A protein has these predicted regions:
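Hydrophobic beta-strand scaffold residues
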Residues: 14, 57, 79-80, 155, ...
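Glycine-rich, highly charged phosphate/nucleotide-binding loops
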Residues: 15-24, 34-46, 170-176
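Phosphate/diphosphate ligand-binding glycine-rich loop within oxidoreductases
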Residues: 33-109
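N-terminal glycine-/charge-rich "phosphate-binding" loop or analogous flexible N-terminal tail
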Residues: 1-32
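Phosphate-coordination loops involved in phosphoryl transfer and adenosine-cofactor binding
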Residues: 31, 55, 128-131
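Short loop/helix-cap segments at secondary-structure boundaries that form the rim of catalytic
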Residues: 4-6, 26-30, 68-75, 148, ...
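Rossmann-like dinucleotide/phosphate-binding beta-alpha-beta segment
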Residues: 120-181
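Structural alpha-helical scaffold elements that stabilize or flank donor/cofactor-binding regions
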Residues: 27-28, 49, 177-181
Length: 181
């Protein structure tokens, strides 16, 4: 695969495991300069354990990195990186999944594979008649809300830190209200 090609091209040794890092299996990183993770426990004790094993960097394969104790990483001199995605791409993908779900696209595609073009179970809903809630109004959440605003649906938002820009197109509500509606 691509990882093997890049490792060979750049003279990098790597190991791989499907298990999430824990205090019990952290020794798998012994001798490694960096550990690449998806969002999982990267609390102070976990970072200390990796540091004690010689790990110098944590590379997070997600946009968010709030699961990493950045203060502890700084204290240990560990480098932290995360993946960067264009908010538009992620937002559009999320909206596509919403639309496909509302229109029963999965069912329609499966029925089409067997030449069933009847309407049974294929009628969906129109998003313009829906209330859509977005949890988290950072760059991606704001982009989702901006793009959805053109569909005419009612928009609700929840975030601990409210954005004045979001207030122009969505209503901030408590999390319980967002789930209920």
């Amino acid at each position: 695969g691509i990882v093997e090609e890049l490792a060979k091209q750049y003279g990098i040794e790597y190991g791989y495991t499907e298990v999430y890092p824990t205090m019990e299996n952290a020794q798998l990183a012994a001798g490694c300069d960096a550990v690449s993770v998806t969002p999982c426990d990267m609390s102070a004790p976990m970072l200390q354990r990796f540091h004690d094993l010689g790990v110098k960097a944590i590379c997070c394969r997600s946009i968010g990195y709030d699961h990493i104790d950045l203060e502890k990483a700084r204290e240990l001199g560990m480098k932290i990186s995360n993946a960067d995605y264009p908010p538009e791409g992620v937002a559009n993908f999320a909206i596509m999944l919403m639309l496909m779900s509302l229109r029963n696209a999965g069912h329609i595609l499966k029925r089409g594979e067997v030449q069933d073009y009847s309407l049974k179970g294929k009628l969906g809903r129109d998003i313009s008649h829906c209330t859509v809630g977005v949890i988290g109004t950072g760059r991606i959440g704001q982009t989702v809300l901006k793009h959805l605003s053109g569909f005419g649906c009612r928009l609700l938002a929840y975030d601990l830190y409210q954005s004045e820009e979001v207030k122009k197109i969505a209503e901030y509500v408590p999390l319980d209200t967002l789930f209920a509606e």
